[in-house]
Amino acid sequence: MAGQPGHMPHGGSSNNLCHTLGPVHPPDPQRHPNTLSFRCSLADFQIEKKIGRGQFSEVYKATCLLDRKTVALKKVQIFEMMDAKARQDCVKEIGLLKQLNHPNIIKYLDSFIEDNELNIVLELADAGDLSQMIKYFKKQKRLIPERTVWKYFVQLCSAVEHMHSRRVMHRDIKPANVFITATGVVKLGDLGLGRFFSSETTAAHSLVGTPYYMSPERIHENGYNFKSDIWSLGCLLYEMAALQSPFYGDKMNLFSLCQKIEQCDYPPLPGEHYSEKLRELVSMCICPDPHQRPDIGYVHQVAKQMHIWMSST
C-alpha cells in the first residue's frame, strides 16, 4: 500500500477497535481451515470509498459501526493467491503485527476471513507519503533540507527498531510505505506481508519489475534478514537526499541494475548540501556484505543525534 493506486495511506485512532464489541462468529473449519480470530465481520463496517487496489487486494476507507472510528479495510483474495501453508504463515505473521504498538507504525487493528477473503482492519493515515514528498521537491527542483530529512528519518528508525526488537522484519521499506500525517508524524505501513502479497509489494517498483531497493543477498536468493531492512533504510535515506534511488537509471534493464546493486555503484551525495555524517551513514547501510552493515540500534542513535543537532542549529 503506497501513495499511488494499489498502495494507500492508513492512519487514525486504534483504541480497542472491535476487540471487545464485535460479534463472535463461529469458524467453519472446512471452508476456512486457517481462520483468524473472528472479532469483527463486514457487517460491522460502512465502506465509504475505495482508496487503493492491487492484483489480489482492494483497500477501502471505512467506518467501524461499533465505535464510529474511521479505518482502512484491506480485502485480500487469500484463497486465490496462496496455498494452505502460505495462508497459515500469513495468519501467523498478522498475529505478530497486531502485537506491534508504536506511534510511528500503522496499527493492525483486527483481521478476519469472510466470503473467502482475508479482511485486515488498519489504522488510517489519510495524509501523504514520503514518495509524494520526494516527487514534490523534485518537481520544484529543490533539495529536501537536511534538517527535514533527519526529522522524518529518525521517526522511521524508531518504528523499525520497535519491529526488530520484537523479531519482526519489515521486508519492504521504501518511500511509498512511509506515510506522513498532517502534523508531520511518520507512520510506517505495509508491515512484513510483502512476501505474501508479492504481486503488489515485492520491492520498490518505480518501473514494473524493477526492484530498486533489493539488497545483494536477495539478488543472490540468500534470503531476507534484519540487515536487509538496514540496506533499505540506507537506500531511503539516500533517496531523501538525492531525490532518486541510488541505483536508478533511465535505460537500465534488470541485469544491469543487479550489477549496480552488487557493486554498490551509485553517485555520491553532494558534500556541499549534506553532512558527512549523513553520507557516512548511507555508505554504512548500503554495504554489499550484510554482516558489515550496522544494526538498527546504531542507525537510530545516529539519526537521533543528527536530528537533535540539526534542530538546535
UniProtKB/Swiss-Prot annotation:
Main location per the UniProt record: cytoplasm
Keyword Cell membrane: no
Binding site for ATP: 51-59, 74
InterPro entries: Kinase-like_dom_sf, Prot_kinase_dom, Protein_kinase_ATP_BS, Ser-Thr/Tyr_kinase_cat_dom, Ser/Thr_kinase_AS
Triggers of expression: Up-regulated during the M phase of cell cycle progression. Down-regulated in both replicative and premature senescence of cancer cells.
Keyword Magnesium: yes
Gene Ontology CC entries for this record: centriolar satellite; cytoplasm; cytosol; microtubule; nuclear speck; nucleoplasm; nucleus; protein-containing complex
Entry-linked PANTHER family: MITOGEN-ACTIVATED PROTEIN KINASE KINASE KINASE 20-RELATED
Family, per entry: Belongs to the protein kinase superfamily. NEK Ser/Thr protein kinase family. NIMA subfamily.
Protein name: Serine/threonine-protein kinase Nek6
